[in-house]
Every structure is written in C-alpha cells, then in structure tokens.
Amino acid sequence: MEEISLMNDYLKIKKYYINHDQLVSHRFLCNSKECVMSNECCCKIFDVEISPREMQRIISIMDVISNYCSNLKTGKYYRNVFEEEDQRYTIDKKANEYCVFSYFDKSGDLKCAVHSAALEIHKDPYYYKPFVCSIWPVTFFKDMSKRTFIDLDTESHVPCIKKKAMNEKTIDLELLNIILIIMGKDIVSLRNFFKQHNFPR
C-alpha cells in the first residue's frame, strides 16, 4: 500500500499533495439547470484550453458531435472552432458565451456534445473530452520539484460546489474519482483509505 501522510492541509501520497481540507469540506453535484439559472456555469465562465492532441481527438468525431450542435457545420464543411496560440488551442464560445460544444437536451439540461458523441459511438467520453473539463472542479499544478498539488476550485461560486456541514469529514466519491483520474487508476490505496477511515481534518 502507498504511504499516506498528512502535511498541514495536504494529504501526501507519493508525489501528490491533495488539499484534504478543501475536498473534505465541499460537495460537488453537477446540476446544469441550477448553474444556468444562476448565470455561473463552468461551460460559460471559463475559457477551455486544449493541447494539439486533444484537438485532434475532438476533430476525429466531429461528424457525430455536429449532430448535437448544428452551429458546428456550414453546408458540408465544419467550422474551425479552435483559436491557436503558441501550440495551444482555445475552444470558441457561442454568442451567448457558452462553450461552442454545449447544447440543451429535450429536458432542458445543458450537455456537452463531445461527451454525448463519445457515448453514442460507445467510446470513453474522457478520452475525447478536454482534460480540464473531465477533472473540473478539481484543479492541479506541478511545481519546479515535479510535485503535483491537487486543489478544489472554490473561487468561481458555481452552485454545484456546496459547503458541507462541519461534522461531515469524508470525501465525496465524485471528487475522489476525479482525483484518481489525475493520479492514475493504478493508485488504489487512496480510494481504499477513504473507504476505511474518516480521515481527520
């Protein structure tokens, strides 16, 4: 089992430093209708930057994606919805400031066309979706020593991130699964640790 220790507010496992206090004290439950009503939606307030590889993956299923977003196609041609700068690309937004790949389904829920397209062709959505979208509201950065610090975005005031009661001291499974995407599925000790213990805050 991987060695786990607590350093200030951070849980240390290998080269990863997880902001335990932030992640334990908040709950994440995606509710697009609530976010749209509040005008604070991740699909609107953030600019999504992707790598060339991520862009190519999206382009490879653009024919399916365009079934969900008619604005992606002009005649028989697909629009260029990526802005390039220094070998990084930013996904365009619509006139309403939402991501160009966002759409509303029949029930009025805001959805990601990339995610929906991947499911339609029976592929893993997280292979095609931008990495920053897959892990949000969890964020991370690497310092000069190649240590990875994992935090929660608590600054954007998006309504799907809620403060938990003070007596709740376990991390939500939804957030834990996102952390495992960053760390890699082979690191199972973190999942087992949270299942077996109420880790002290």
Predicted regions and their residues:
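Short loop/turn segments that flank or connect secondary-structure elements
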Residues: M1-R201
